[in-house]
């Protein structure tokens, strides 16, 4: 039997934290990862980020906003290619996630801004986008999708293992030798970022300094945790805007930040009750791993050492973009992206729309 073809894939991710666009290159056959290539990021300009925030929670696509966003992705690919001496022809496939503005799986609706056909024209390379739509259309949650990549990454690690991605929304992947279970745990950084932006004009709590000075308000925490989402068994997914920071309006900035950190970490900790067995190791990826208060509280609540994914040699800033490079190849090969135990679909299924340049 001939060896499987190894593809050079470039993945693009702009997450619910709204901080910018990540681009990463990997080489993969769609099953295993052969090598990691370059990674670059492009922060959103504050004015553009503000316009994206205004688009959150709406079902309408602004053609102008989508076009601008797509051009930004093309610019990042060009910057990465130039910096790392990568020829356009070296890239076999581009995985383009786009920017989620609305996610309502209960209504079989999910929307990611980003024009795949336009990106294919701008780059001259085939592009796969719209990764979540097929899953949602048949009643799946459409998220999380990265677990199939987490499983490939964790092949040589001691299992069972939990990989937590703390972006705007937090999700967890439970991986053992014969099981893959994944679901959103609750808010990640989104509420903390929204709080800091509303009260200070800054985009996040640098090094968790505000939360470190505050005290948790137990009544607000109880209020957050009483949400129906936490009563649901997995698989389940969460829209970035499912919760509102108005619950913390009466609190000082520091106490509100501490309460929101407690909310994120308590929700992640409670997720372990759904695992089929205890895990040997907790690894954290996403922006939340840079917040010392989140990492400290997570370790304390779990009663285990929680480490960033860099401790096992991965790049936590690149993983989400790498995941969509990996999924682009799987989509090309008609391999599954989602499973009954990750999104609730009735059977494993692929997804994504392929666009070729003219």
Where are these regions (language model features)?
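Glycine-rich phosphate-binding loop plus the immediately following alpha-helix
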Residues: 21-24, 36-54, 128-155, 162-231
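Short glycine-rich phosphate-binding loop at a beta-alpha junction
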Residues: 87-97, 277-288
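Active-site neighborhood for divalent-cation/phosphate handling
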Residues: 93-157
